[in-house]
């Protein structure tokens, strides 16, 4: 059986954690920022956990993470 391949787009977007969860960056922070408030942009900083409903598909895309 051949080796499973990692989806490279997923490996650039998600980072695996030791407990088996994944972290991801926030969306909506690239452009059209003038209409967003400072508070809104501040809350978009940092990372979030991948939601449990999406964990199965992220694990399938990154089999060795």
Swiss-Prot record:
UniProt keyword annotation of Acetylation present: no
UniProt-listed PROSITE patterns: RIBOSOMAL_L35
Protein name from the UniProt record: Large ribosomal subunit protein bL35
Gene3D superfamilies with a match to the protein in the record: 4.10.410.60
Organism: Cupriavidus pinatubonensis (strain JMP 134 / LMG 1197)
InterPro entries found in the cross-reference section: Ribosomal_bL35, Ribosomal_bL35-like, Ribosomal_bL35_CS, Ribosomal_bL35_sf
BP term (GO), one: translation
Cellular component, GO annotation: cytosolic large ribosomal subunit
Family, similarity comment: Belongs to the bacterial ribosomal protein bL35 family.
Classification via Pfam families: Ribosomal_L35p
Gene that this polypeptide is encoded by: rpmI
Region spans: Disordered: 1-27
Keywords linked to the UniProt accession: Ribonucleoprotein, Ribosomal protein
Listed GO MF terms: structural constituent of ribosome
Biased composition (Basic residues): 1-15
